[in-house]
């Protein structure tokens, strides 16, 4: 619309406008039949040169797919997050309300369906009006605007700032090129294709492009659902998306909307009654904004940490570009659909179990995280923690499940158990001793004694003497596991842990020290869950997988992910370990039970001063690791503490994490699943209890009572 000004044009402006008027007249006379304004005097020279300049321009514009947001989806197809630099969702013509098309044509180019890309009448009127009142009235058709926006978009996508600027520079050359491109484009595209392309590429806000994204931003519904009043508001934005932004400048937006409504009434698109109702409706009453941030910050608190993990895998994958920068640009412009392994039912249950035990911002200051991996595939099905994702005070972007490094405590003992079984030892062999002091030479690697400092095993009262491996595992007897470690290849325990993915903070094999047998080493819940998933699936360790398939904007597959697994322990040993872990939990984990008596294998872990507590375990369907501690102060004692309103003198892996987090969660997620037992495999001959010596009051055939 023309913005009239009271002042007159200065002489220099007047001459420029006169020259432009005659130059344009000559151009149109050459190009458009029926329009001819003679050129006289020196201006005629300009007019005669126009066709020559025009003929030297490229005849076709390369219309490319514009930047479009990418979607990260869960396993059920729900949107986890959107990624973009420009918020745009490209939609076909039939997904845009007809009244929206009518509104944009009415206000931007009412002769759109009559001209061939350039509107001579509109250009002449604009020149005359500008000449008469010193203002500046545009004369670009929708086709010309589409050309201009397309060139800008191509420059943006190709990182060519000069090309992007060339689309808007105030030169005759640019205008000539735009006109020729528009005329050519009208020969290769239908009016509906041009209009749809324009509505998908035009700006509707500071970073919002295309009518679909605009409709979702301002009204929280699709462009197909736009009504006439909403269409008028959006149609008015394209002239100046920042100045007329209804979220920041509602008064200006309302004035502009009313102008569009007037034109729509004059064109017969709406009635007089509609017009009166429309202009009397405050813009604020129309808006239902959806200003969800892009990226994982826009994901819900439940899914944000998995989002962080999944996008990290995407950005590390060279299938999407040979540099991090290219992969990130593809993510934010390529209109990708990234499908993931996240099971929303499991993830919701994980979050609920965590916050039921330790609420967000609990007075204890404790953090907790849990992750579930599918045995046999490595698919990460759930990843949650009791914190809010973000950069504000009280929030964190640190992913404790994937990136947290916390001492694992007795959970590490499972690798001693595996090495014990790998070397052919029986589950019923006697392990442990009363003397808890181990001196130099009692541990060996490759058959050769190794040097270690004298080590005095600390243990809870009542854990002296000998046990079999089932009871030693269930009761988590430190001295028994140190004894087992002294009777196998000591270094291979740590090599085996590394094979399962459990290393030190630098990715190196954990140092072969007696203290590390008991869990001084650190790891993440994801790594521990994945290691136990390998035990649950015949010793097959799979790479943790967050992505399943990535497709481009046309749904062509860029990459489909398949399980990447390798054998790290023999199936026999894995089954034996599963059997022992199942027997030990069934016998000794009285606080941790699954509904219906469903069998599971697990190992708890508690570090010095109860600073970190764990329960990591599995069924044939799911492997889950849960951790409790303080992420920012992982050595700080967790004793004499109130958690969720309840006092604890100390907490432990089995009685706190297992009872309050792991078991409730695993019971919930197994509802409706098949009841599958753990492997029934030979783990050694059950020793015959020695017959006690008969006494006068005890028959010789009385059996010895078990524990």
Model-identified regions with their sequence ranges:
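A penicillin-recognizing enzyme superfamily signal
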Residues: 336, 340-362, 370-372, 383-385, ...
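Extracytoplasmic/periplasmic proteins that interact with beta-lactams or build/remodel peptidoglycan
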Residues: 41-42, 59-69, 74, 137-145, ...
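Bacterial peptidoglycan biogenesis and beta-lactam-recognition machinery
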Residues: 106-119, 132-138, 185-191, 203-208, ...
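Active-site loop and adjoining helix of the penicillin-binding protein/serine DD-peptidase-beta-lactamase fold
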Residues: 178, 182, 186, 238-256, ...
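Conserved catalytic neighborhood of penicillin-recognizing serine enzymes
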Residues: 132-156, 291-300, 425-493, 553-583
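Acidic helix-start/capping segments at beta-turn-to-alpha-helix junctions
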Residues: 98, 117-133, 144, 276-299, ...
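Peptidoglycan glycan-strand catalytic modules in the bacterial/periplasmic cell-wall system
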Residues: 66-271, 327, 388, 474-478, ...
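N-terminal type II signal-anchor transmembrane helix
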Residues: 1-71
């Amino acid at each position: 619309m023309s913005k009239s000004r009271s002042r007159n044009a200065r002489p220099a402006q007047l001459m420029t406008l006169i020259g432009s008027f005659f130059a344009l007249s000559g151009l149109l006379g050459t190009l458009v039949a029926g329009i001819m304004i003679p050129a006289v005097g020196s201006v005629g020279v300009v007019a005669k040169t126009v066709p020559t300049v025009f003929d030297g321009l490229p005849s076709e514009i390369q219309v490319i797919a514009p930047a479009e947001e990418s979607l990260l989806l869960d396993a059920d197809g729900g949107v986890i997050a959107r990624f973009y630099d420009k918020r745009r969702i490209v939609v076909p013509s039939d997904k845009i309300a007809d009244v929206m098309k009518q509104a944009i044509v009415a206000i931007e180019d009412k002769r759109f369906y009559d001209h061939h890309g350039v509107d001579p009448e509109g250009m002449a009127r604009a020149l005359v009006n500008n000449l008469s009142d010193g203002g500046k009235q545009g004369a670009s058709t929708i086709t010309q605007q589409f050309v201009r926006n397309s060139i800008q978009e191509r420059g943006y996508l190709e990182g060519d700032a000069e090309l992007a600027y060339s689309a808007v520079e105030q030169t005759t050359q640019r205008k000539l090129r735009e006109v020729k491109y528009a005329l050519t484009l009208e020969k290769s595209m239908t009016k509906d294709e041009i209009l749809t392309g324009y509505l998908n590429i035009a700006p509707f806000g500071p970073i919002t492009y295309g009518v679909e994204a605009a409709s979702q931003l301002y009204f929280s519904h699709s462009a197909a659902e736009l009504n006439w009043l909403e269409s008028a508001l959006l149609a008015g934005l394209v002239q100046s998306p920042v100045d007329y932004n209804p979220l920041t400048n509602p008064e200006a937006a309302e004035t502009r909307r009313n102008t569009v409504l007037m034109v729509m009434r004059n064109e017969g698109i709406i009635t007089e009654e509609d017009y009166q109702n429309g202009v009397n409706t405050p813009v604020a009453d129309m808006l239902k904004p959806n200003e969800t941030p892009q990226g994982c910050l826009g994901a819900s608190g439940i899914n944000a940490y998995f989002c962080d993990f999944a996008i990290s895998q995407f950005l590390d994958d060279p299938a999407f570009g040979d540099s991090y920068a290219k992969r990130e640009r593809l993510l934010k412009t390529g209109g990708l659909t990234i499908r993931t392994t996240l099971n929303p039912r499991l993830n919701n249950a994980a979050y609920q179990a965590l916050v039921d035990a330790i609420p967000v911002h609990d007075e204890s200051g404790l953090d907790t995280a849990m992750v579930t991996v599918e045995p046999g595939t490595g698919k990460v099905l759930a990843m949650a923690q009791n914190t809010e994702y973000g950069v504000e005070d009280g929030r964190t972007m640190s992913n404790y499940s994937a990136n947290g490094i916390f001492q694992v405590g007795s959970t590490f003992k499972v690798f001693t158990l595996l090495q014990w079984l790998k070397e052919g030892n029986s589950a019923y062999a006697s392990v442990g001793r009363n003397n808890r002091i181990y001196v130099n030479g009692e541990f060996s690697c490759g058959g050769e004694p190794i040097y270690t400092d004298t080590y005095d095993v600390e243990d809870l009262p009542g854990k002296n003497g000998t046990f079999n491996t089932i009871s030693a595992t269930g009761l988590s007897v430190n001295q028994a596991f140190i004894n087992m470690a002294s009777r196998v290849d000591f270094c291979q325990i740590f090599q085996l842990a590394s094979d399962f993915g459990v290393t030190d903070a630098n990715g190196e094999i954990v140092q072969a020290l007696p203290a590390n047998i008991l869990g001084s080493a650190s790891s993440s819940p994801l790594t521990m869950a994945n290691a136990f998933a390998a035990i649950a699936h015949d010793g097959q360790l799979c790479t943790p997988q967050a992505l399943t398939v990535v497709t481009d904007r046309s749904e062509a597959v860029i990459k489909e992910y398949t399980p990447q697994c390798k054998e790290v322990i023999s199936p026999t040993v894995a089954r034996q370990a599963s059997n022992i872990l199942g027997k030990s939990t069934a016998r000794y984990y009285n606080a941790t039970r699954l509904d219906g008596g469903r069998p599971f294998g697990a190992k708890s872990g508690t570090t010095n001063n109860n600073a970190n507590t764990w329960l990591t375990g599995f069924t044939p369907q799911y492997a889950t690791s849960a951790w409790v501690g303080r992420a920012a102060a992982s050595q700080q004692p967790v004793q004499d503490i109130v958690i969720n309103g309840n006092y604890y003198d100390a907490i432990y892996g089995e009685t706190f994490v297992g009872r309050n987090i792991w078991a409730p969660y695993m019971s919930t997620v197994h509802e409706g699943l098949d009841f599958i037992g753990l492997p029934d495999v030979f783990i050694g001959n059950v020793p015959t209890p020695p017959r006690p010596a008969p006494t006068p009051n005890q028959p010789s055939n009385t059996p010895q009572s078990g524990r």
